[in-house]
Protein backbone atom coordinates (compact mmCIF):
# COMPACT_ATOMS: atom_id res chain seq x y z
CA UNK A 1 0.00 0.00 0.00
CA UNK A 2 2.65 2.53 -0.96
CA UNK A 3 2.84 5.09 -3.71
CA UNK A 4 6.29 4.12 -4.99
CA UNK A 5 8.02 5.97 -7.77
CA UNK A 6 4.77 7.21 -9.26
CA UNK A 7 3.70 8.77 -6.00
CA UNK A 8 6.99 10.61 -5.58
CA UNK A 9 7.13 11.67 -9.20
CA UNK A 10 3.96 13.72 -8.77
CA UNK A 11 5.67 15.86 -6.14
CA UNK A 12 8.04 18.55 -7.49
CA UNK A 13 11.75 17.90 -6.93
CA UNK A 14 12.09 20.97 -4.75
CA UNK A 15 9.25 19.87 -2.48
CA UNK A 16 10.56 16.31 -2.15
CA UNK A 17 13.51 17.58 -0.10
CA UNK A 18 11.44 20.06 1.92
CA UNK A 19 11.56 19.38 5.65
CA UNK A 20 8.22 18.91 7.30
CA UNK A 21 7.13 18.20 10.84
CA UNK A 22 4.25 15.76 11.33
CA UNK A 23 1.44 16.74 13.63
CA UNK A 24 1.25 14.94 17.01
CA UNK A 25 -1.24 12.28 15.87
CA UNK A 26 0.71 11.60 12.68
CA UNK A 27 4.02 11.56 14.60
CA UNK A 28 2.57 9.05 17.04
CA UNK A 29 1.63 6.83 14.13
CA UNK A 30 5.15 7.05 12.63
CA UNK A 31 6.87 6.32 15.93
CA UNK A 32 4.75 3.22 16.40
CA UNK A 33 6.62 1.65 13.48
CA UNK A 34 10.11 2.69 14.57
CA UNK A 35 10.46 6.36 13.62
CA UNK A 36 12.66 8.38 16.03
CA UNK A 37 12.85 11.85 14.45
CA UNK A 38 10.63 14.87 14.55
CA UNK A 39 11.31 16.24 11.06
CA UNK A 40 11.26 14.41 7.73
CA UNK A 41 11.42 15.18 4.06
CA UNK A 42 8.31 14.88 1.95
CA UNK A 43 9.84 11.92 0.14
CA UNK A 44 10.32 10.06 3.39
CA UNK A 45 6.78 10.83 4.48
CA UNK A 46 5.32 9.56 1.22
CA UNK A 47 7.41 6.41 1.26
CA UNK A 48 7.01 5.52 4.93
CA UNK A 49 4.01 3.23 4.97
CA UNK A 50 5.27 0.50 7.25
CA UNK A 51 2.33 1.16 9.55
CA UNK A 52 -0.13 -0.29 7.04
CA UNK A 53 1.97 -3.42 6.59
CA UNK A 54 2.47 -3.85 10.33
CA UNK A 55 -1.22 -3.54 11.09
CA UNK A 56 -2.16 -5.50 7.94
CA UNK A 57 -4.83 -3.00 7.04
CA UNK A 58 -4.81 -3.86 3.34
CA UNK A 59 -7.26 -6.20 1.66
CA UNK A 60 -5.91 -9.68 1.03
CA UNK A 61 -7.50 -9.96 -2.42
CA UNK A 62 -7.31 -6.33 -3.53
CA UNK A 63 -4.13 -5.19 -1.86
CA UNK A 64 -4.35 -1.60 -3.07
CA UNK A 65 -7.39 -1.02 -0.83
CA UNK A 66 -6.70 -0.05 2.80
CA UNK A 67 -9.37 -0.34 5.51
CA UNK A 68 -8.72 1.98 8.45
CA UNK A 69 -12.14 2.59 9.98
CA UNK A 70 -11.23 1.14 13.40
CA UNK A 71 -7.62 2.26 13.47
CA UNK A 72 -5.52 5.31 14.28
CA UNK A 73 -4.93 5.83 10.57
CA UNK A 74 -8.66 6.26 10.04
CA UNK A 75 -8.81 8.90 12.75
CA UNK A 76 -5.85 10.64 11.15
CA UNK A 77 -7.18 10.72 7.58
CA UNK A 78 -10.86 10.88 8.48
CA UNK A 79 -11.90 8.16 6.01
CA UNK A 80 -12.93 4.52 6.63
CA UNK A 81 -10.99 3.24 3.61
CA UNK A 82 -8.96 4.48 0.66
CA UNK A 83 -7.02 3.20 -2.32
CA UNK A 84 -3.31 3.76 -2.74
CA UNK A 85 -3.92 4.29 -6.43
CA UNK A 86 -5.68 7.57 -5.67
CA UNK A 87 -2.50 9.68 -5.37
CA UNK A 88 -4.20 13.03 -5.22
CA UNK A 89 -6.45 12.07 -2.34
CA UNK A 90 -3.54 10.57 -0.39
CA UNK A 91 -1.40 13.68 -0.82
CA UNK A 92 -4.23 15.90 0.38
CA UNK A 93 -4.76 13.75 3.49
CA UNK A 94 -1.02 13.74 4.23
CA UNK A 95 -0.59 17.50 3.76
CA UNK A 96 -3.29 18.14 6.33
CA UNK A 97 -1.16 16.51 9.01
CA UNK A 98 2.19 18.17 8.16
CA UNK A 99 3.78 21.49 9.07
CA UNK A 100 6.52 22.86 6.82
CA UNK A 101 9.75 23.71 8.67
CA UNK A 102 11.02 27.26 7.99
CA UNK A 103 14.45 27.89 6.41
CA UNK A 104 15.84 29.48 9.59
CA UNK A 105 15.19 26.31 11.53
CA UNK A 106 16.77 24.39 8.73
CA UNK A 107 19.95 26.53 8.74
CA UNK A 108 20.27 26.31 12.51
CA UNK A 109 20.09 22.57 12.36
CA UNK A 110 22.49 22.30 9.41
CA UNK A 111 25.43 19.92 9.77
CA UNK A 112 28.30 18.67 7.68
CA UNK A 113 27.92 17.21 4.22
CA UNK A 114 28.71 13.71 5.35
CA UNK A 115 26.09 13.92 8.06
CA UNK A 116 23.54 15.17 5.57
CA UNK A 117 24.40 12.29 3.28
CA UNK A 118 24.48 9.57 5.89
CA UNK A 119 21.50 10.71 7.94
CA UNK A 120 18.87 9.63 5.37
CA UNK A 121 20.43 6.22 5.59
CA UNK A 122 19.78 6.21 9.29
CA UNK A 123 16.27 7.51 8.69
CA UNK A 124 15.71 4.77 6.23
CA UNK A 125 16.95 2.37 8.84
CA UNK A 126 14.35 3.59 11.25
CA UNK A 127 11.58 3.38 8.71
CA UNK A 128 12.58 0.13 7.08
CA UNK A 129 12.97 -2.49 9.79
CA UNK A 130 13.86 -5.09 7.19
CA UNK A 131 17.09 -3.25 6.30
CA UNK A 132 18.01 -2.38 9.89
CA UNK A 133 20.40 -5.33 10.51
CA UNK A 134 22.13 -4.69 7.17
CA UNK A 135 22.87 -1.08 8.13
CA UNK A 136 24.33 -2.12 11.45
CA UNK A 137 26.80 -4.40 9.68
CA UNK A 138 27.78 -1.94 6.96
CA UNK A 139 28.20 1.23 9.01
CA UNK A 140 28.02 1.25 12.78
CA UNK A 141 28.75 4.97 13.13
CA UNK A 142 25.71 6.03 11.12
CA UNK A 143 23.40 4.92 13.93
CA UNK A 144 25.14 7.12 16.51
CA UNK A 145 24.76 10.25 14.41
CA UNK A 146 22.16 12.77 15.56
CA UNK A 147 18.66 12.17 14.18
CA UNK A 148 17.89 15.87 13.89
CA UNK A 149 20.54 16.58 11.26
CA UNK A 150 19.57 18.32 8.07
CA UNK A 151 18.53 16.24 5.06
CA UNK A 152 18.82 18.95 2.49
CA UNK A 153 21.05 17.99 -0.39
CA UNK A 154 22.32 20.66 -2.74
CA UNK A 155 24.05 20.34 -6.07
CA UNK A 156 27.29 21.73 -4.65
CA UNK A 157 27.39 19.14 -1.89
CA UNK A 158 26.88 16.40 -4.45
CA UNK A 159 29.74 17.76 -6.62
CA UNK A 160 32.16 18.07 -3.67
CA UNK A 161 31.62 14.48 -2.62
CA UNK A 162 31.35 12.98 -6.09
CA UNK A 163 34.71 11.20 -5.81
CA UNK A 164 34.83 10.86 -2.05
CA UNK A 165 32.43 8.03 -1.30
CA UNK A 166 31.54 6.12 -4.46
CA UNK A 167 30.57 3.04 -2.48
CA UNK A 168 28.33 5.05 -0.19
CA UNK A 169 26.65 6.67 -3.17
CA UNK A 170 26.05 3.31 -4.76
CA UNK A 171 24.69 1.98 -1.51
CA UNK A 172 22.54 5.10 -1.09
CA UNK A 173 21.21 4.72 -4.61
CA UNK A 174 20.47 1.13 -3.82
CA UNK A 175 18.71 2.17 -0.61
CA UNK A 176 16.58 4.68 -2.45
CA UNK A 177 15.54 2.04 -4.92
CA UNK A 178 14.80 -0.57 -2.32
CA UNK A 179 13.06 1.96 -0.13
CA UNK A 180 10.70 2.84 -2.97
CA UNK A 181 9.83 -0.82 -3.24
CA UNK A 182 9.84 -1.48 0.50
CA UNK A 183 6.16 -2.22 0.62
CA UNK A 184 6.39 -4.51 -2.38
CA UNK A 185 9.15 -6.42 -0.59
CA UNK A 186 6.99 -6.65 2.50
CA UNK A 187 4.14 -8.05 0.44
CA UNK A 188 6.41 -10.71 -1.01
CA UNK A 189 8.03 -11.54 2.32
CA UNK A 190 5.05 -11.33 4.64
CA UNK A 191 2.24 -12.65 2.45
CA UNK A 192 3.94 -15.07 0.08
CA UNK A 193 7.05 -16.73 1.44
CA UNK A 194 8.00 -14.97 4.71
CA UNK A 195 11.55 -14.29 3.50
CA UNK A 196 12.36 -11.51 5.93
CA UNK A 197 14.46 -13.70 8.23
CA UNK A 198 16.63 -15.02 5.40
CA UNK A 199 17.00 -11.55 3.89
CA UNK A 200 18.30 -10.06 7.16
CA UNK A 201 21.14 -12.59 7.44
CA UNK A 202 22.55 -11.80 3.99
CA UNK A 203 25.08 -9.09 3.23
CA UNK A 204 24.48 -5.95 1.22
CA UNK A 205 25.32 -7.30 -2.27
CA UNK A 206 22.94 -10.26 -1.86
CA UNK A 207 20.22 -7.96 -0.60
CA UNK A 208 20.83 -5.72 -3.56
CA UNK A 209 20.42 -8.66 -5.89
CA UNK A 210 17.13 -9.47 -4.21
CA UNK A 211 15.94 -5.89 -4.44
CA UNK A 212 17.05 -5.61 -8.06
CA UNK A 213 15.22 -8.83 -8.86
CA UNK A 214 12.07 -7.44 -7.31
CA UNK A 215 12.47 -4.10 -9.06
CA UNK A 216 12.83 -5.81 -12.40
CA UNK A 217 9.36 -7.26 -12.07
CA UNK A 218 7.74 -4.26 -10.36
CA UNK A 219 8.23 -0.60 -11.11
CA UNK A 220 5.54 0.79 -8.89
CA UNK A 221 2.90 -0.43 -6.46
CA UNK A 222 0.26 1.52 -8.32
CA UNK A 223 1.27 0.54 -11.84
CA UNK A 224 -0.44 -2.24 -13.69
CA UNK A 225 2.90 -4.06 -13.84
CA UNK A 226 3.39 -3.86 -10.07
CA UNK A 227 4.33 -6.73 -7.80
CA UNK A 228 0.88 -6.88 -6.26
CA UNK A 229 -0.79 -7.05 -9.64
CA UNK A 230 1.55 -9.79 -10.79
CA UNK A 231 0.98 -11.56 -7.52
CA UNK A 232 -2.78 -11.43 -7.92
CA UNK A 233 -2.59 -12.62 -11.51
CA UNK A 234 -0.21 -15.42 -10.60
CA UNK A 235 -2.53 -16.77 -7.93
CA UNK A 236 -5.75 -15.78 -9.63
CA UNK A 237 -8.62 -18.22 -9.27
CA UNK A 238 -11.04 -18.49 -12.15
CA UNK A 239 -14.49 -17.22 -11.42
CA UNK A 240 -17.68 -19.10 -12.04
CA UNK A 241 -18.46 -16.96 -15.06
CA UNK A 242 -15.14 -17.70 -16.71
CA UNK A 243 -15.51 -21.40 -15.92
CA UNK A 244 -18.90 -21.56 -17.54
CA UNK A 245 -17.55 -19.68 -20.51
CA UNK A 246 -14.69 -22.15 -20.93
CA UNK A 247 -17.07 -25.08 -20.75
CA UNK A 248 -19.32 -23.63 -23.40
CA UNK A 249 -16.31 -22.83 -25.56
CA UNK A 250 -15.05 -26.40 -25.31
CA UNK A 251 -18.43 -27.78 -26.27
CA UNK A 252 -18.61 -30.03 -23.21
CA UNK A 253 -22.13 -28.99 -22.38
CA UNK A 254 -25.02 -28.47 -24.69
CA UNK A 255 -27.77 -26.02 -23.96
CA UNK A 256 -31.44 -26.45 -24.80
CA UNK A 257 -30.95 -24.31 -27.89
CA UNK A 258 -28.68 -26.98 -29.40
CA UNK A 259 -31.46 -29.62 -29.33
CA UNK A 260 -33.29 -30.12 -32.58
CA UNK A 261 -36.98 -31.02 -32.42
CA UNK A 262 -38.65 -32.64 -35.39
CA UNK A 263 -42.40 -32.85 -35.72
CA UNK A 264 -43.54 -36.06 -37.39
CA UNK A 265 -47.12 -36.74 -38.41
CA UNK A 266 -48.05 -40.39 -38.99
CA UNK A 267 -51.07 -41.24 -41.08
CA UNK A 268 -52.48 -44.75 -40.86
CA UNK A 269 -53.83 -45.89 -44.20
CA UNK A 270 -56.65 -48.13 -43.14
CA UNK A 271 -58.33 -50.01 -45.99
CA UNK A 272 -62.05 -50.28 -46.19
CA UNK A 273 -64.28 -52.39 -48.37
CA UNK A 274 -65.10 -49.36 -50.49
CA UNK A 275 -62.53 -46.73 -51.41
CA UNK A 276 -63.49 -43.21 -50.44
CA UNK A 277 -63.42 -40.60 -53.17
CA UNK A 278 -65.10 -37.86 -51.19
CA UNK A 279 -61.79 -36.10 -50.51
CA UNK A 280 -60.98 -35.64 -54.20
CA UNK A 281 -61.80 -32.04 -55.15
CA UNK A 282 -61.84 -32.90 -58.87
CA UNK A 283 -64.82 -35.25 -58.48
CA UNK A 284 -68.13 -33.40 -58.20
CA UNK A 285 -71.58 -34.69 -57.37
CA UNK A 286 -72.49 -34.61 -61.06
CA UNK A 287 -69.95 -37.37 -61.72
CA UNK A 288 -71.63 -39.80 -59.31
CA UNK A 289 -73.75 -42.55 -60.87
CA UNK A 290 -77.02 -43.97 -59.57
CA UNK A 291 -77.51 -47.70 -59.19
CA UNK A 292 -80.49 -49.04 -61.10
CA UNK A 293 -81.21 -51.70 -58.49
CA UNK A 294 -81.09 -49.85 -55.17
CA UNK A 295 -80.90 -46.20 -56.30
CA UNK A 296 -77.60 -45.73 -54.38
CA UNK A 297 -75.34 -42.84 -55.45
CA UNK A 298 -71.85 -44.20 -56.05
CA UNK A 299 -68.52 -42.56 -56.90
CA UNK A 300 -67.60 -42.58 -60.58
CA UNK A 301 -64.57 -44.87 -60.41
CA UNK A 302 -65.81 -48.11 -58.76
CA UNK A 303 -67.79 -50.13 -61.34
CA UNK A 304 -69.90 -51.90 -58.70
CA UNK A 305 -72.54 -50.48 -56.41
CA UNK A 306 -71.39 -50.01 -52.86
CA UNK A 307 -74.64 -51.45 -51.48
CA UNK A 308 -75.82 -54.24 -53.77
CA UNK A 309 -72.69 -54.83 -55.87
CA UNK A 310 -74.58 -54.39 -59.10
CA UNK A 311 -72.41 -53.63 -62.10
CA UNK A 312 -72.76 -50.11 -63.40
CA UNK A 313 -74.68 -49.56 -66.61
CA UNK A 314 -72.66 -48.73 -69.71
CA UNK A 315 -69.49 -49.77 -67.95
CA UNK A 316 -68.05 -51.78 -70.87
CA UNK A 317 -67.97 -50.69 -74.55
CA UNK A 318 -70.66 -52.02 -76.89
CA UNK A 319 -69.63 -54.22 -79.85
CA UNK A 320 -70.69 -53.29 -83.38
CA UNK A 321 -71.68 -56.88 -84.14
CA UNK A 322 -74.00 -56.76 -81.17
CA UNK A 323 -75.95 -53.91 -82.76
CA UNK A 324 -76.91 -56.15 -85.68
CA UNK A 325 -78.74 -58.66 -83.52
CA UNK A 326 -80.30 -56.16 -81.13
CA UNK A 327 -83.69 -56.26 -82.83
CA UNK A 328 -83.97 -60.05 -82.91
CA UNK A 329 -82.78 -60.39 -79.31
CA UNK A 330 -85.27 -57.80 -78.18
CA UNK A 331 -88.16 -59.59 -79.86
CA UNK A 332 -87.24 -62.94 -78.36
CA UNK A 333 -86.82 -61.53 -74.87
CA UNK A 334 -90.21 -59.81 -75.08
CA UNK A 335 -91.76 -63.11 -76.11
CA UNK A 336 -90.31 -64.75 -73.02
CA UNK A 337 -91.70 -61.97 -70.80
CA UNK A 338 -88.35 -60.39 -69.78
CA UNK A 339 -88.10 -56.61 -69.34
CA UNK A 340 -85.15 -55.43 -71.40
CA UNK A 341 -85.13 -51.63 -71.93
CA UNK A 342 -83.54 -50.38 -75.17
CA UNK A 343 -81.91 -53.73 -75.73
CA UNK A 344 -78.71 -52.65 -73.88
CA UNK A 345 -78.78 -55.37 -71.23
CA UNK A 346 -76.82 -58.52 -71.60
CA UNK A 347 -78.80 -61.70 -72.10
CA UNK A 348 -79.05 -64.44 -69.52
CA UNK A 349 -77.88 -68.00 -70.04
CA UNK A 350 -81.28 -68.99 -71.50
CA UNK A 351 -81.29 -66.10 -73.94
CA UNK A 352 -77.73 -66.95 -75.02
CA UNK A 353 -78.80 -70.48 -75.96
CA UNK A 354 -81.79 -69.20 -77.97
CA UNK A 355 -79.73 -66.75 -80.03
CA UNK A 356 -76.82 -69.08 -80.77
CA UNK A 357 -78.12 -70.02 -84.23
CA UNK A 358 -78.72 -66.42 -85.33
CA UNK A 359 -75.56 -64.76 -83.97
CA UNK A 360 -72.68 -67.11 -83.12
CA UNK A 361 -70.21 -64.25 -82.70
CA UNK A 362 -72.27 -62.68 -79.91
CA UNK A 363 -71.45 -65.40 -77.37
CA UNK A 364 -67.73 -65.14 -78.11
CA UNK A 365 -67.71 -61.39 -77.59
CA UNK A 366 -69.74 -61.64 -74.39
CA UNK A 367 -67.17 -63.95 -72.83
CA UNK A 368 -64.36 -61.65 -73.95
CA UNK A 369 -66.10 -58.64 -72.42
CA UNK A 370 -66.51 -60.53 -69.15
CA UNK A 371 -62.84 -61.53 -69.00
CA UNK A 372 -61.57 -58.02 -69.78
CA UNK A 373 -63.74 -56.35 -67.12
CA UNK A 374 -60.80 -55.74 -64.73
CA UNK A 375 -58.58 -54.09 -67.32
CA UNK A 376 -60.97 -51.60 -68.88
CA UNK A 377 -60.85 -47.81 -68.53
CA UNK A 378 -63.53 -46.09 -66.40
CA UNK A 379 -63.94 -43.41 -69.05
CA UNK A 380 -65.72 -45.67 -71.55
CA UNK A 381 -69.18 -44.49 -72.43
CA UNK A 382 -70.97 -47.82 -73.01
CA UNK A 383 -70.83 -51.33 -71.49
CA UNK A 384 -72.72 -54.59 -71.11
CA UNK A 385 -74.27 -55.27 -67.70
CA UNK A 386 -75.63 -58.47 -66.21
CA UNK A 387 -79.34 -58.63 -65.49
CA UNK A 388 -79.38 -60.46 -62.17
CA UNK A 389 -77.45 -60.84 -58.93
CA UNK A 390 -76.59 -64.45 -59.69
CA UNK A 391 -74.81 -63.49 -62.87
CA UNK A 392 -72.84 -60.85 -60.96
CA UNK A 393 -71.62 -63.40 -58.43
CA UNK A 394 -70.67 -65.85 -61.16
CA UNK A 395 -68.77 -63.09 -62.93
CA UNK A 396 -66.82 -62.26 -59.76
CA UNK A 397 -65.80 -65.88 -59.32
CA UNK A 398 -64.63 -66.09 -62.91
CA UNK A 399 -62.75 -62.82 -62.46
CA UNK A 400 -60.71 -64.06 -59.50
CA UNK A 401 -60.01 -67.43 -61.15
CA UNK A 402 -58.93 -66.09 -64.53
CA UNK A 403 -57.19 -62.91 -63.35
CA UNK A 404 -53.63 -64.18 -63.44
CA UNK A 405 -54.17 -66.32 -66.54
CA UNK A 406 -55.51 -63.50 -68.68
CA UNK A 407 -53.15 -60.64 -67.72
CA UNK A 408 -51.70 -60.45 -71.21
CA UNK A 409 -54.54 -61.95 -73.28
CA UNK A 410 -57.59 -60.16 -71.93
CA UNK A 411 -57.53 -56.63 -73.33
CA UNK A 412 -60.37 -54.27 -73.86
CA UNK A 413 -60.62 -52.14 -76.90
CA UNK A 414 -58.82 -49.37 -75.05
CA UNK A 415 -55.94 -51.69 -74.13
CA UNK A 416 -54.86 -51.95 -77.75
CA UNK A 417 -53.23 -48.54 -77.43
CA UNK A 418 -49.58 -48.48 -76.24
CA UNK A 419 -48.45 -47.66 -72.69
CA UNK A 420 -48.98 -43.99 -71.84
CA UNK A 421 -45.59 -43.88 -70.06
CA UNK A 422 -43.16 -45.53 -72.47
CA UNK A 423 -45.39 -45.37 -75.60
CA UNK A 424 -43.81 -48.63 -76.79
CA UNK A 425 -45.20 -51.68 -75.02
CA UNK A 426 -48.89 -52.65 -74.83
CA UNK A 427 -51.05 -51.92 -71.81
CA UNK A 428 -50.67 -55.17 -69.91
CA UNK A 429 -49.96 -53.92 -66.35
CA UNK A 430 -53.06 -53.23 -64.27
CA UNK A 431 -52.60 -50.91 -61.29
CA UNK A 432 -54.77 -52.24 -58.44
CA UNK A 433 -55.82 -50.18 -55.42
CA UNK A 434 -58.57 -51.41 -53.15
CA UNK A 435 -61.47 -52.79 -55.18
CA UNK A 436 -60.58 -50.81 -58.28
CA UNK A 437 -57.81 -50.82 -60.83
CA UNK A 438 -56.61 -48.94 -63.90
CA UNK A 439 -55.09 -50.32 -67.07
CA UNK A 440 -53.07 -47.49 -68.53
CA UNK A 441 -49.45 -48.71 -68.68
CA UNK A 442 -47.34 -51.73 -69.46
CA UNK A 443 -46.26 -54.20 -66.80
CA UNK A 444 -42.61 -52.94 -66.45
CA UNK A 445 -43.71 -49.31 -66.10
CA UNK A 446 -46.39 -50.26 -63.57
CA UNK A 447 -43.81 -52.20 -61.53
CA UNK A 448 -41.53 -49.16 -61.52
CA UNK A 449 -44.36 -47.01 -60.19
CA UNK A 450 -45.03 -49.52 -57.42
CA UNK A 451 -41.34 -49.84 -56.56
CA UNK A 452 -40.90 -46.07 -56.28
CA UNK A 453 -44.04 -45.69 -54.11
CA UNK A 454 -45.75 -43.53 -56.72
CA UNK A 455 -49.55 -43.12 -56.72
CA UNK A 456 -51.81 -44.20 -59.52
CA UNK A 457 -51.48 -41.71 -62.42
CA UNK A 458 -55.25 -41.76 -63.00
CA UNK A 459 -56.81 -41.39 -59.54
CA UNK A 460 -53.75 -40.65 -57.38
CA UNK A 461 -54.56 -43.55 -55.04
CA UNK A 462 -51.74 -45.59 -53.40
CA UNK A 463 -50.78 -48.59 -55.53
CA UNK A 464 -51.30 -51.88 -53.70
CA UNK A 465 -50.36 -54.42 -56.36
CA UNK A 466 -49.65 -54.79 -60.06
From Swiss-Prot:
Per UniProt, Zn(2+) binds at 291, 294, 305, 308
Per the database record, which ranges form the SWIB/MDM2 domain?
18-100
Give the region (Sufficient to promote the mitochondrial pathway of apoptosis) as residue ranges.
1-92
Q: What class of enzyme is it?
A: transferase
In the record, biological process GO terms are: apoptotic process; negative regulation of apoptotic process; negative regulation of DNA-templated transcription; negative regulation of transcription by RNA polymerase II; protein ubiquitination; regulation of biological quality; regulation of cell cycle
Region Region II, annotated ranges: 228-317
Descriptive protein name = E3 ubiquitin-protein ligase Mdm2
Amino acid sequence: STDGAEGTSQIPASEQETLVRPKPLFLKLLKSVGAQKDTYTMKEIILSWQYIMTKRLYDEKQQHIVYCSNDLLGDLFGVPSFSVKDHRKIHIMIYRNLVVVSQQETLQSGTSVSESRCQPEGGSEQKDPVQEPQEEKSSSDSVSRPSTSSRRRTISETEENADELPGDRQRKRHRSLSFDESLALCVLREICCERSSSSESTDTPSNQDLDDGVSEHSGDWLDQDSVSDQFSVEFEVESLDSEDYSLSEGGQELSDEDDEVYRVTVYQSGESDVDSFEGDPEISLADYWKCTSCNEMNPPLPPLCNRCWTLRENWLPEDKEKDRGDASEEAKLEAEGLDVPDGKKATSSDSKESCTEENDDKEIYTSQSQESEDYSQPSTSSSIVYSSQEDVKEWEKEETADKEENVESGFSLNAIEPCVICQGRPKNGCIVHGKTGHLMSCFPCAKKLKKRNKPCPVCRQPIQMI
